[in-house]
Amino acid sequence: MSKKDVIELEGTIVEALPNAMFKVELENGHTILGHISGKMRMNYIKILPGDGVTVQISPYDLSRGRIVYRKKN
């Protein structure tokens, strides 16, 4: 799957789960399961409930996504 096939959406972290997984509430009201991307792990970027994030979702499984960016605020 290439980068142009992914869907990027904005959301807010609702809950932190084990194994670096998070429940993310998207702007459209849906709640998905998200994991941290490898670059965010390498740079030790911490994510807490309430943070605004950008999530990439595969068109094949719309219930899971990859957290690729944490907003500044």
Swiss-Prot record:
Highest taxon above the source species: Bacteria
Keywords: Cytoplasm, Initiation factor, Protein biosynthesis, RNA-binding, rRNA-binding
Gene3D superfamilies cross-referenced by the UniProt entry: Nucleic acid-binding proteins
Main location: cytoplasm
SUPFAM superfamilies given in the database record: Nucleic acid-binding proteins
Any single GO CC term annotated in Swiss-Prot or TrEMBL for this entry: cytosol
Boundaries of every S1-like domain copy: 1-72
Disulphide-bonded residues: none
Record-level Gene Ontology MF annotations: ribosome binding; rRNA binding; translation initiation factor activity
PROSITE patterns from the UniProt entry: S1_IF1_TYPE
Family annotation (Pfam families): eIF-1a
Subcellular localization: Cytoplasm
UniProt function note: One of the essential components for the initiation of protein synthesis. Stabilizes the binding of IF-2 and IF-3 on the 30S subunit to which N-formylmethionyl-tRNA(fMet) subsequently binds. Helps modulate mRNA selection, yielding the 30S pre-initiation complex (PIC). Upon addition of the 50S ribosomal subunit IF-1, IF-2 and IF-3 are released leaving the mature 70S translation initiation complex.
Quaternary structure and partners: Component of the 30S ribosomal translation pre-initiation complex which assembles on the 30S ribosome in the order IF-2 and IF-3, IF-1 and N-formylmethionyl-tRNA(fMet); mRNA recruitment can occur at any time during PIC assembly.
Family membership noted in the UniProt record: Belongs to the IF-1 family.
Name used for this protein in its record: Translation initiation factor IF-1
Recorded name of the encoding gene: infA
